[in-house]
Amino acid sequence: MAESGESPRLSDELGPVDYLMHRGEANPRTRSGIMALELLDGTPDWDRFRTRFENASRRVLRLRQKVVVPTLPTAAPRWVVDPDFNLDFHVRRVRVSGPATLREVLDLAEVILQSPLDISRPLWTATLVEGMADGRAAMLLHVSHAVTDGVGGVEMFAQIYDLERDPPPRSTPPQPIPEDLSPNDLMRRGINHLPIAVVGGVLDALSGAVSMAGRAVLEPVSTVSGILGYARSGIRVLNRAAEPSPLLRRRSLTTRTEAIDIRLADLHKAAKAGGGSINDAYLAGLCGALRRYHEALGVPISTLPMAVPVNLRAEGDAAGGNQFTGVNLAAPVGTIDPVARMKKIRAQMTQRRDEPAMNIIGSIAPVLSVLPTAVLEGITGSVIGSDVQASNVPVYPGDTYLAGAKILRQYGIGPLPGVAMMVVLISRGGWCTVTVRYDRASVRNDELFAQCLQAGFDEILALAGGPAPRVLPASFDTQGAGSVPRSVSGS
């Protein structure tokens, strides 16, 4: 929140995974922008809104930094404070023809997400959307995945929020010192440090080889067993967990997003009744929705490949960068009983989390990050093994405000990195939202899918006991004929 002090120091060097994300910005099929859509109970004061982001950009340097890539790969790409930083390029406002509903804002979000960020500037934008029904507004916060992941973004942008509607004014932090560093400058800097880097690399390699040789001599069986075990684990981690769905195989550049709202207490109660966690209940509800959709179209399946990102951040880690890995599940969409479905999901998640090679992508990212673009895109296309990705991002438990407006809901809109569907669960202020962004070449019946999404999570909420709580559609109505965001009409 705005009360917090200066954020932990972020590394100026792009990590290999971050650089992979950055390189993907040039291709619409590998673009990895993430977005938070926040629904506000009123229109924020514009000057206060801008000031919040101005101050945040002074406290969190990453919001003022751009990426500089050396002309030749003699050094790692770096984040540098942009000498041409202009807040007006990043913080904008638009007025929709209205009164607009969440449906129109989601459609606007699709346009923004599919528009490339300017890689010569800091990689984020915040768009205030005015003109919604009942005097409400929305904010669309768009960030490149090269900057941070979902969990890191929560911490990075905590500076813009308040815990009360009208807090006392706060002092303005000092302005960061801009840096003039060109790609050629960074290349020359890398060349100058090359002898030291080579010697250091050789010494590290020799040290590692001596250490490995010593272990092999003293414990030959366990050393060989450990290497083979890691290799087998790597195969399990990288291999597809289930056969892909025949309905979800096509890909395009046309996408759509749907969303539902659930009270956090209701989902927690249902999860507890089913013997699982909120994440288990969330994934089970998603599987139930996918089962209904497949059955309605006459293509029943028992499983499909689903990737679930797992946060690797430790307490005290800096907000920037990507610190997650993926767990591949054979999602039990064909399991009818919701409790049995939750148990199968929990068992797989527990087993996969314990894999020695769970973070193998992070291990090979340094090699992948220096491959030619055409080769990298070919490899990426061949290793995407999931139909669906499903993330879970906890945000802030209590009420929060932005420039005088209360945040009613937050919806997480993720990228589609070769998958048919990206699903994000956000928990904030006593509510959960489930936002599904899908490729319309894979999911062709929008109305049917929305109905299946609602029914799949209603089934999970029914575990909470009577009177059973119900899902509240956010981007559609129950008849599929309109777009009334009824879930927040009385908030």
UniProtKB/Swiss-Prot annotation:
Keywords on record: Acyltransferase, Glycerol metabolism, Lipid biosynthesis, Lipid metabolism, Transferase
GO BP term, pick one: glycerol metabolic process
Keyword Chaperone: no
Protein induction: Constitutively expressed at a low level, it is not further induced by hypoxia or nitric oxide exposure.
Pfam families: WS_DGAT_C, WS_DGAT_cat
Catalytic activity reported: an acyl-CoA + a 1,2-diacyl-sn-glycerol = a triacyl-sn-glycerol + CoA
Domain of life: Bacteria
GO cellular component, one term: plasma membrane
Protein EC: 2.3.1.20
Active-site residues annotated for this sequence: 145 (proton acceptor)
Pathway noted in the entry: Glycerolipid metabolism; triacylglycerol biosynthesis
Keyword Transferase carried by entry: yes
Enzyme class, first EC level, given as a word: transferase
Family: Belongs to the long-chain O-acyltransferase family.
Record-given protein name: Putative diacyglycerol O-acyltransferase Rv2484c
Organism: Mycobacterium tuberculosis (strain ATCC 25618 / H37Rv)
